[in-house]
Amino acid sequence: MAKEKRETIRLFSSSKNGHFYSTTKNKRTSSEKMTLKKFDPFARKHVIYIESKNS
């Protein structure tokens, strides 16, 4: 069976309220941690989300 090219990750909110987004990323082309600015419904504003492995 072939090895998966994409890895499932979670993007956790930097406001530390437990909200996260699930997404995938290519293991080969992007080895550094992903950070995105997205809307946090608990904080009701846009915050930075930081990558963490989905286990």
UniProtKB/Swiss-Prot annotation:
Query: Cross-referenced InterPro entries, in alphabetical order?
Result: Ribosomal_bL33, Ribosomal_bL33_CS, Ribosomal_bL33_sf, Ribosomal_zn-bd
Could you list this entry's UniProt keywords, alphabetically sorted: Ribonucleoprotein, Ribosomal protein
Q: Which GO terms describe its molecular function?
A: structural constituent of ribosome
Superkingdom of origin? Bacteria
User: Is-annotated flag, keyword Ribonucleoprotein?
Assistant: yes
Which NCBIfam families does the record associate with it? PRK00595.1, rpmG_bact
Q: What is this protein called?
A: Large ribosomal subunit protein bL33
Q: Species name for this entry? A: Blochmanniella pennsylvanica (strain BPEN)
- Tell me the gene name: rpmG
